[in-house]
């Protein structure tokens, strides 16, 4: 799950987002293979789920042609280094009603962003 990170619509068949370091890097391990992004509404008045099916490329931030766009709108509440740009070429979409998604009132971003890294250091 990703939160607090803007999803940029590049064109009708392409989206991208800035990825940050964290407890793992599973997205990069599957670059070039199938990827599914799920976007959903948790508001009371607008239930919806959209799945974006495609193929991702993963590029270090400093080497990405989308670098300027990605850095123009970083996630202010994520206190982690920026890692890479995930660029997804969309091959298909699917929508569903979203009424199974709970209504959610946003309180705050989590502030314990280093927690996953602590486990990695113990296991290393």
Where are the language model's segments positioned?
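Binding-site signature for planar aromatic cofactors or substrates
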Residues: 1-124
């Amino acid at each position: 799950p990703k939160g607090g990170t803007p999803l940029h619509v590049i064109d009708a068949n392409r989206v991208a987002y800035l990825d940050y370091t964290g407890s793992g890097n599973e997205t990069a391990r599957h670059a070039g293979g199938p990827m599914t992004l799920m976007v959903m509404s948790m508001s009371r008045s607008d239930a919806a789920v959209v799945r974006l099916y495609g193929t991702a490329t993963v590029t270090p931030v400093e080497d990405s042609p989308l670098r300027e766009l990605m850095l123009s709108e970083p996630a202010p509440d994520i206190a982690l280094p920026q890692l890479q740009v995930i660029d997804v070429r969309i091959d298909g979409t699917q929508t569903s009603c979203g009424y199974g998604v709970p209504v959610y009132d946003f309180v705050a971003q989590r502030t314990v962003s280093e927690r996953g890294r602590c486990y990695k250091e113990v296991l290393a």
